[in-house]
Amino acid sequence: MTSVELTRALNERGNDTKFIATGQTGILIEGDGIPLDCVKADFVSGAAERMVLEHQHHEILMIEGQGSLVHPSYSGVTLSLLHGCHPHGLILCYEIGRHKVTGIDHLAIPPLAEILKLNESLASISFPCSVIGISVNSRRATPAEADAERDRLRDEFGLPVADVFRDGPGELVDAILQLQQQRLKD
């Protein structure tokens, strides 16, 4: 949902932004896209790249993420999506209080710093890419807990951090626009 909210907010600020749906729910929301988990593994990167090329006339492409690089069941799709879309920047999504990989109770989620580095490393295979913000899912946290965790993440990573539903997407939108401006200068 982060990418949907960011797309909406970017368009409201006058940017020509396209949400690229990569899963069934995203397709229902957007009306188009490709359900990457239904594509044969060898072709997922190409399917992602095709969507980027089809919509490259937009100023900003907001590509829906899939799974997690640290989830053994879904990391193949996640990695293929990263390699196929060649992102310029990433918004890392994180849920407060989730300590185990969903559906694999014996597998702990690594520290967020490790996940961030892993995403940046694997997204930078073809072109440089970095995490430019963190989207926090604080649905299981009290407002005070969410505020404290957001502040902790800002201090630890020096990045914009927001729960797009609790805080609004503004801080993350600013990070995207800053990256866009920097890329236009380069």
What are these regions (language model features)?
Residues 1-186:
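Flexible phosphate-sensing "switch/lid" loops adjacent to ATP/NTP-binding sites
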